[in-house]
Curated annotation (Swiss-Prot):
It comes from Bordetella petrii (strain ATCC BAA-461 / DSM 12804 / CCUG 43448). CDD domains: TPP_DXS, TPP_PYR_DXS_TK_like. Catalyzes the acyloin condensation reaction between C atoms 2 and 3 of pyruvate and glyceraldehyde 3-phosphate to yield 1-deoxy-D-xylulose-5-phosphate (DXP). Belongs to the transketolase family. DXPS subfamily. The keyword Iron does not apply. Thiamine diphosphate binds at H75, A116, H117, S118, G148, A149, N177, Y284, E366. GO terms for biological process: 1-deoxy-D-xylulose 5-phosphate biosynthetic process; isopentenyl diphosphate biosynthetic process, methylerythritol 4-phosphate pathway; terpenoid biosynthetic process; thiamine biosynthetic process. It holds the Pfam family DXP_synthase_N. This is 1-deoxy-D-xylulose-5-phosphate synthase. Pathway: Metabolic intermediate biosynthesis; 1-deoxy-D-xylulose 5-phosphate biosynthesis; 1-deoxy-D-xylulose 5-phosphate from D-glyceraldehyde 3-phosphate and pyruvate: step 1/1. The keyword Magnesium applies. Its cofactor is Mg(2+); thiamine diphosphate. InterPro entries: Dxylulose-5-P_synthase (IPR005477), THDP-binding (IPR029061), Transketo_C/PFOR_II (IPR009014), Transketolase-like_Pyr-bd (IPR005475), Transketolase_BS (IPR020826), Transketolase_C (IPR033248), Transketolase_CS (IPR049557).
């Protein structure tokens, strides 16, 4: 792969020096480099292949970093990173100590706003535009948002606010690739499809180049766009009603269309909305054919594509959940499955196939997902909301006000609890224990392995109120999984190893590491299973029979399960040394999951080391003293 032009690019200033022919050639080199780079490190691929021309056009036309570009979600920002001096850093993409897979303000002045969760770009860019106006600074503010992210209410809240905000320059670029991760759903998607099928898009695609080679004066261009938008593609009035001047759709892979259009929009004042149509995976046929498979691949050979490896004997927790959901749906016709645009990631593909009338992908709309579930529960349905831990944060008010306050029967299956590895701090599910256990009526369960995940899912499903089961990303330990739908006693843990001196109270999958550490310490290990209701009887029993308590959790220490144990001891007036092990009070960057846990002292060796360091000067480690 030749990179003759790419080798000359060290900043967007270099892009602005290229002629039209060179710019098109650079697009091909940049796309090839993204493909080669991601195939070596893993990462988001399809979305980045689809934004190469758009990224080049934006940096060609706008004076970055003076002008602000905010990338919604941000997983499509690899071309942006490469063009802004981070090409060499792509070798360490999403690795510990390497560059992030998302825009990050601390990483580059070109990253105007940190993103990773969807639908925030318009709000952030609007805030920047108002700040620039107030400071008397003349600059452009661009929010690049995908069609999937546009389905979230926050995007429309921002546009509604922008429509009544005077004297600002704000350009919203809708990157319409008919995909988020899964294909987008809902009325907005149908609306955009009508736009793309309109005569204006057909005309722009067929004769756009000829028109733009003879670009008229700005005012005449604006007048013609207005005629097209209102007379030929009437649905565009939705965006115009918010106060935006709508332009498009145009071909997002045609630099001859993108560059002059952006140049003319830059010359206009006020609120502008550019609708570009791109193809996810563009330029790599395998990704074009299956953009979901190539959304976030691991390492692969681009010459042959992603190969199906030998199936692992260890199921992922996501797979365990998906199978349980189908099994429970067979037994209970009231079960309804809900996901906010994460069908594949949350394991609902088979459920959708088998129970299409009971499957609801509500789009990137976590607030709606939770209250939609509440409404179903009001009428006797049994909703299960399959959602990543980090995304439930977006529906927290609804969880409290609409579900828990009314004590409604909604089960939350929280995937990606704890550290998530390469996606880093933005996607880590570190806070669910703290933010859920304080909510009245809420059950919080944390299984130690795959089989226990199935047991706790059934237990929480049968509980007649709000309940959550948190489980991590990736495969379990290979535990044998019972095929039934058995339950366990609510709020009761179980002793997995009887020792002496020290009792380790483990919450979740770190139970396995705790058991390994306990072998060296001759410690007792309790698999607590529930954070709420917590097993008070077991805590007091272990405190009475041991010299010290150690709590272990893959969650934030502050407000976490260890805090719940201490609250029980304090309430009962029990004085015993307690060591809390968990995630520290800081955001934890991307890296390999196992390596990150080891670095935080949450592998078996680290747990043993922390216990010895805390109690080495006492005689609490009665077993360890003989080792």
């Amino acid at each position: 792969m030749t990179t003759e032009l790419l080798d000359r690019i060290h900043s967007p200033d270099d892009v602005r020096q290229l002629d039209r022919r060179e710019l098109k050639a650079l697009a091909e080199e940049l796309r090839g480099f993204v493909l080669e780079s991601v195939s070596r490190t893993g990462g988001h691929l399809s979305s980045n292949l689809g934004t190469v021309e758009l990224t080049l056009a934006l940096h060609r036309v706008f004076d970055t970093p003076h002008d602000r570009i905010v990338w919604d979600v941000g997983h499509q920002s690899y071309p942006h990173k490469i063009l802004t001096g981070r090409r060499a850093g792509m070798a360490s993409l999403r690795q510990e100590g390497g560059i992030s897979g998302f825009p990050k303000r601390s990483e580059s002045e070109y990253d105007a706003f940190g993103t990773a969760h969807s639908s925030t770009s318009i709000s952030a860019a609007l805030g920047m535009a108002v700040a620039s106006r107030n400071a008397g600074i003349q600059r452009q503010h661009i929010a690049v948002i995908g069609d999937g992210a546009m389905s979230a209410g926050m995007a429309f809240e921002a546009m509604n606010n922008a429509g009544v905000t005077p004297d600002i320059n704000l350009l919203v670029v809708l990157n319409d690739n008919d995909m988020s991760i899964s294909p987008p759903v809902g009325a907005l998607n149908r609306y955009l499809a009508r736009l793309m099928s309109g005569r204006f898009y057909a005309a722009a695609k067929n004769v756009g180049r000829a028109m733009l080679q003879h670009v008229p004066p700005v005012l005449e261009l604006a007048r013609r766009f207005e005629e097209h938008a209102k007379g030929m593609v009437t649905p565009a009035t939705l965006f115009e009603e918010f106060g935006f001047n709508y332009v498009g759709p145009i071909d997002g892979h045609d630099l001859d269309a993108l560059v002059p259009t952006l140049q003319n929009l830059k010359a206009l004042q006020g609120l502008q909305f550019l609708h570009v149509v791109t193809r996810k995976g563009h330029g790599y046929k395998l990704a074009e054919a299956d953009p979901v498979l190539y959304h976030g691949p691991g390492k692969f050979d681009p010459a042959v594509g992603i190969q199906q490896g030998k199936a692992s004997t260890r199921k992922t927790f996501t797979q365990v959940f998906g199978q349980w959901l189908c099994d429970m749906a067979e037994r209970d016709e009231r079960l309804v499955g809900i996901t906010p645009a994460m069908r594949e990631g949350s394991g609902l593909v088979e459920f959708e196939r088998r129970f299409p009338r009971r499957y609801f992908d509500v789009g990137i709309a976590e607030q709606h997902a939770v209250t939609f579930a509440a409404g179903l529960a009001c009428e006797g349905q049994k909703p299960v909301v399959a959602i990543y831990s980090t995304f439930l944060q977006r529906g927290y008010d609804q969880l409290i006000h609409d579900v828990a306050l009314q004590n409604l029967d909604v089960t939350f299956a929280l995937d990606r609890a704890g550290l998530v590895g390469a996606d880093g701090a933005t996607h880590a599910g570190n806070y669910d224990i703290a933010y859920l256990r304080c909510v009245p009526n809420m059950v919080v369960a944390a299984p130690s392995d795959e089989n226990e995940a199935r047991l706790l899912l059934s237990t929480c499903y049968e509980y007649p109120g709000p309940a959550s089961v948190r489980y991590p990303r990736g495969a379990g330990r290979g535990a044998e999984i019972s095929p039934g739908l058995d339950t366990v006693p609510m709020g009761k843990g179980i002793v997995r190893r009887q020792g002496r001196g020290i009792a380790i109270l483990a919450f979740g999958t770190l139970t396995q590491a705790a058991l390994a550490a306990a072998e060296a310490l001759d410690a007792t290990v309790a698999d607590m299973r529930f954070v709420k209701p917590i097993d008070r009887e077991l805590i007091l029993q272990l405190a009475a029979g041991h010299d010290a308590i150690v709590t272990v959790e893959e969650a934030a220490i502050m407000g976490g399960a260890g805090s719940a144990v201490i609250e029980v001891l304090h309430h009962e007036g029990v004085v015993v040394p307690v060591l809390q092990l968990g995630l520290p009070d800081r955001f934890i960057d991307h890296g390999d999951q196992a390596a990150l846990l080891a670095g935080l002292g949450l592998d078996a060796a680290g747990i043993e080391r922390s216990i010895r360091a805390r109690f080495e000067k006492s005689n609490l480690q009665s077993g360890a003293q003989t080792k």
